Regions:
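ATP/NTP phosphate-donor binding region
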Residues: 1-29
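Short glycine-rich anion-binding loops that position phosphate/pyrophosphate groups of nucleotides
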Residues: 37-40, 172, 201-202
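Short, acidic/small-residue loops that bind anionic groups at enzyme active sites
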Residues: 51-76, 84-91, 225, 229
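Structural motif
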Residues: 32-34, 65, 164-166, 197
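Oxyanion-binding "anion nests"
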Residues: 140-184
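N-terminal glycine-rich "phosphate-gripper" loop used for MgATP/nucleotide binding
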Residues: 32-43, 47-48
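C-terminal active-site/capping subdomain that shapes the small-molecule cofactor and substrate pocket
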Residues: 180-230
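Conserved anion/nucleotide-ligand pocket segment
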Residues: 82-149, 153
Length: 230
């Protein structure tokens, strides 16, 4: 897009520029609309986005792809029209640099291409002991935990029942992860799902005050509070 390299403070252009770019892409109706990076400032646009236009673009074949702050767009599309979007790589941070410099590997690139073409048959991931054998069907939704939490209580937060909620985050200490997950639990969101899938929570700093407290501690505690499989 013509505005892809714009800059304004921390953002890829001012609000009007970025809003126009989102709408321009939706009008163009490409097969794939991929975020350049994470999507800083997207929450500023949520009340102004023409959601009918974006939902229509999905119905006409556009696959909106991104993660991190782009989670806001995924949730908005689901909330305003039940539209399917894709939590996936970004053009610059992932596909735009080699694997050894933090980009994605060839297997991920191939899987992504198959997913976009509709040829991907299955994906796999490791689970903790005791979680094997679950067979579930439901709306797969979620994304960045901080973004999911920030949108609760807004009209852009989808009301998903019997879904499979996946969550990830970066640069957040385990206690912040626990606090965010408990907020979802106390708001009743976790109990309404069939399963919670926790992805990678990376690049946080440990503290001497943790005294053994870590992500495993968070998950173990959460399982004592939540009946939904994690």
């Amino acid at each position: 897009d013509e505005a892809a390299l714009k800059r304004h403070q921390r953002f890829a252009g001012d609000d009007d520029t970025r809003l126009a770019a989102v709408h321009r892409v939706a009008h163009a109706n490409p097969s794939v609309a991929m975020a350049t990076r994470g999507g800083y400032g997207l929450t500023r646009l949520l009340d102004r986005i023409d959601w009918k236009l974006l939902v229509r673009s999905v119905e006409h074949g556009t696959r909106w792809v991104g993660y991190s702050d782009f989670t806001a767009l995924h949730l908005g599309l689901l909330a305003h029209g039940g539209a399917i979007s894709w939590a996936g790589p970004t053009a610059m941070e992932d596909l735009g640099r080699p694997d050894e410099r933090g980009g994605v590997d060839d297997v991920t690139v191939s899987c992504f291409a198959e997913a976009m073409s509709g040829e991907l048959e299955a994906v796999g991931f490791r689970t903790d002991p005791g979680c094997d054998g679950l067979s579930l069907r439901g709306t797969l939704w979620g994304g960045n935990l901080t973004m999911v939490n920030s949108m609760m209580g807004t009209p852009h937060f989808p009301k998903v029942r019997q879904g499979i909620l996946f969550l990830e985050d970066v640069n957040e200490h385990p206690y912040r992860i626990e606090r965010a997950l408990l907020q979802l639990h106390q708001a009743g969101v976790l109990a309404q799902q069939k399963a919670i899938v926790l992805g990678a929570f990376t690049e946080y700093r440990k503290s001497p005050l943790d005294r053994g407290y870590n992500l495993k501690s968070v998950i173990a505690y959460l399982r004592t509070q939540v009946k939904t499989p994690i």
